[in-house]
């Protein structure tokens, strides 16, 4: 009977039930919800295929979670610091070439140097940054024709610097400085490349052994006393600097007053020179007139008549003769009076 039943083909109702069971989402080891559904056989082909698909999805989900966890761990790791200049470390400047020609000054710098000294003299109480701001404002408001003067001077200075630089580049001093600069640049590049390279553990240990360790007692009483002494010294230096600046300002005022006095005396001296030249011209004209008018009046007791070169000596001798013999010289005195009256006329 059992063999006969097993040989009977399934009916259409059984096929429909089996189709309904396959359309439901299977779960391994569980039953489908619903009172009308029957439990699935664990060894059915449909259940094995669903379990394989579920296992594949589970493994892919775990792999994605693992990848995302690794990404988060990589993001949480501190990023390696990029190579560059250490914070707090001062960059060393290249040594200056003392033999090189002096660099040219711009028009604004020339105006600032000239105007800054004037402002410091006129207003010594104004601080340096305020003076710089005032000079910058004046330069921006300066007319174009006045500004052109400083720009022309700067252009001349630039031409001078170009010529001197061309001459200097042909000298041995420049060649020596250029070789030293190239060697310094090469050494700096090598040091930077050495810093970029990551040393091994043994190299790190050797570096730590060779590096001296300085124990700086910054919180001890001696260090605090040293800091206080340095602060007191700095305060004293600032005070001395302020006193010297005040003295310098007073001396600048005194120098300006002396300059104005010298200029005033020079103006008076030039006026006196002009007056002297006018008096010399007038005296020369008087000598010429006396020489011309007294040609016929000789000195008493002599035959001496005046000339342009001897008029001063002639007048002195004539005065002595008149004072010595006044009665005998009355005729000469009357003649001289007539001549002088003609001269005045």
Curated annotation (Swiss-Prot):
Keyword Nucleus tagged: yes
Function: Plays a role in neuronal differentiation.
GO cellular-component term (any): nucleus
Chief location: nucleus
The organism's place on the tree of life at top rank: Eukaryota
GO molecular function, one term: DNA binding
Subcellular location as annotated: Nucleus
Residue ranges with Polar residues bias: 22-38, 57-67, 167-178
Bias type Basic residues, positions: 80-94, 179-189
DNA-binding residues (ranges): 101-169
Residue ranges the record marks as coiled coil: 227-285
Official protein name in the record: High mobility group protein 20A
Region (Disordered): 1-130, 166-206
Keyword Hydrolase carried by entry: no
Organism listed in the record: Xenopus laevis
Ranges of Basic and acidic residues composition bias in the record: 112-125
Pfam families from the UniProt entry: HMG_box
InterPro entries (alphabetical): ChromReg_NeuronalGeneExpr, HMG_box_dom, HMG_box_dom_sf
GO biological process, any: regulation of gene expression
PANTHER family the UniProt entry points to: HIGH MOBILITY GROUP PROTEIN 2 (PTHR46040), HIGH MOBILITY GROUP PROTEIN 20A-RELATED (PTHR46040:SF1)
Swiss-Prot/TrEMBL keywords: Coiled coil, DNA-binding, Nucleus, Transcription, Transcription regulation
